[in-house]
């Protein structure tokens, strides 16, 4: 088996995997104030600076289907026998529906695009797991089974500080954002079972929201040693450190602080903090 793994630039994974020859990343076009940016050439912090200074709402669009089609044809010519594509959830992006037909277009390759239901670091962690298993010589069917097990065990909760970013992204009405701000509501967001970002609970004050997120962490990960924990933020270092310290104090032994990439940060806004848990590799 010769396996290629394809993902998109919403996935965040460890630096070492960027050198893997069988990993391919599709760019999600993104722009601020009419200027397009290459996500492979801009750091998270540089993007946050652009967000803070932007006159208009940053805009994202789908990866190009033609680009994926060309890549798949090249992979077939290179002798790849299997392709696994792990992309933004269908509930977030129409890309998944647009590329679904490509799974049956290649006679010499088995092409599979399973639903992921999550993004950011948890999606990147699934990419890492698949690459590790392929490197170890694990069969394709077993890799798919492990991916599904990890995906179905993923959970993520987010504290959004400024509701106006959600309103700008179309996930909350302007009226609701204004009212929520006046009432000091700091909602807990999550990914639904279909992969849609939705309000899990409406909580007043940051302190209460942070407390609720800690409760949810313990509820979802009853065996701390069985899970990888990502604490993810957009310039919310103090809150991220608080969640990190709490996770360690509760017996989690694989906890990492990371930052949201531009695609997700654009929708959640600055000063957002989250955690994502994934069953370990």
From Swiss-Prot:
Residues bound to hexadecanoate: 60, 93
Organism: Lactococcus lactis subsp. lactis (strain IL1403) (Streptococcus lactis)
NCBIfam families: DegV (TIGR00762)
An annotated Gene Ontology molecular function: lipid binding
Protein keywords: Lipid-binding
DegV domain mapped to chain residues: 3-279
Task of the protein: May bind long-chain fatty acids, such as palmitate, and may play a role in lipid transport or fatty acid metabolism.
Organism phylogeny: Bacteria, Bacillati, Bacillota, Bacilli, Lactobacillales
Record protein name field: DegV domain-containing protein YqaC
Origin: domain of life: Bacteria
InterPro entries: DegV (IPR003797), DegV_C (IPR043168), DegV_domain_contain (IPR050270)
Keyword tRNA processing annotated: no
Entry-linked Gene3D superfamilies: 3.30.1180.10, 3.40.50.10170
């Amino acid at each position: 088996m010769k396996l290629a793994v394809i993902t998109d630039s919403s996935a965040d994974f460890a630096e070492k995997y960027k050198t893997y020859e069988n990993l391919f990343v599709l760019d999600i076009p993104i722009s601020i104030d009419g200027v397009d940016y290459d996500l492979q050439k801009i750091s998270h912090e540089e993007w946050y600076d652009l967000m803070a200074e932007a006159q208009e709402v940053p805009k994202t669009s789908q990866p190009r289907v033609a680009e994926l089609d060309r890549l798949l044809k090249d992979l077939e010519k290179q002798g790849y026998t299997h392709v696994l594509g792990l992309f933004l959830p269908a509930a977030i992006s129409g890309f998944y529906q647009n590329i679904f037909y490509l799974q049956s277009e290649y006679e010499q390759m088995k092409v599979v695009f399973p639903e992921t239901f999550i993004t950011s670091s948890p999606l990147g962690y699934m990419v890492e797991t698949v690459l590790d298993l392929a490197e170890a010589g694990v069969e394709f069917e077993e890799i798919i089974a492990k991916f599904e097990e990890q995906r179905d065990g993923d959970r993520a909760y987010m504290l959004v500080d400024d509701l106006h970013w959600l309103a700008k992204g179309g996930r909350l009405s302007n009226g609701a954002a204004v009212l929520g701000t006046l009432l000091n509501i700091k909602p807990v967001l999550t990914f639904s079972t279909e992969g849609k970002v939705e309000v899990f609970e409406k909580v007043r004050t940051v302190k209460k929201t942070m407390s609720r997120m800690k409760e949810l962490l313990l509820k979802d990960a009853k065996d701390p040693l069985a899970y990888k924990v990502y604490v993810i933020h957009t310039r919310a270092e103090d809150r991220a450190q608080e969640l990190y310290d709490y996770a360690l104090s509760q017996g989690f032994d694989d906890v990492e602080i990371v930052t949201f990439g531009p695609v997700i940060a654009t929708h959640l806004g600055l000063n957002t903090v989250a955690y994502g848990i994934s069953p370990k590799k």
